[in-house]
Amino acid sequence: MASKYPEEGPITEGVEEDFNSHSTSGLDLTSGNKEEPLISLALLSMHTSKIVVWIRDHFFVKILSFGGKQKLYYICNQCHKGIPESGYITLNTKYYLYEKGPTETGTKGLTLMRRHVQNSPCFLNSRKESGTPKTDPTRPATSYSLCRSDYQEAGCSRPTPSNSESVCNGLGQPSERGHTSGESGGIMEEVSFISWLEGLWGEGFDYAN
């Protein structure tokens, strides 16, 4: 049975940035405008210009091009090209943690680092020190080693969820507001495809700012 996903090739139409310059090593950006009705319906309600989504073991980047045309481009299948168990993708100055298997909440997909976490002194210092966020492939939620070991020295304030931020689990049901790691103080927000769709019509999912 032929694959429903596009063949590999460079991203061309609608691109406003060189995403390769923002991606971690191992990510092979490939193209493909998807026309699935469910995805097309979701794109009608997107509030942001660029976002990464996970759909059945494949990664996509959604791009809003000039003229308001919205397109979904195929990035890669997480099971090939030597993609590690976990890592970071940077798009539109936002950091996404991707994982191969089920997350702590039982869903699969991408985790968006909340703005007040990715702008925290410990995260910024860890990037300055190593070039990329420090990751633990077995426990990605506790990957902020600088925050964990030099918590006070880095001047990190433990982030807390905002009342305006809502989180849905992989079934589209309300869940706890993010993943809190007692070691690192980091708060994560689940962005599986179903919760992403669910959040399009809710509050707290406008990633444009």
UniProtKB/Swiss-Prot annotation:
Residues 21-30, 132-143 have a biased composition (Polar residues). It comes from the Viruses. The keyword DNA-binding applies. Keywords: Activator, DNA-binding, Transcription, Transcription regulation. Residues 1-30, 123-143, 156-185 are annotated as: Disordered. The keyword Transcription applies. GO terms for molecular function: DNA binding. Transcriptional transactivator that activates the viral internal promoter (IP), thereby enhancing its own expression. This transactivation is repressed by nuclear factor I. Also transactivates the long terminal repeat (LTR) promoter, thereby inducing structural gene expression, initiating the late phase of infection. It is therefore a key regulator of viral gene expression. It directly binds to and activates DNA target sites of viral promoters and those of distinct cellular genes. Required for viral replication. This is Protein Bel-1. It comes from Feline foamy virus.
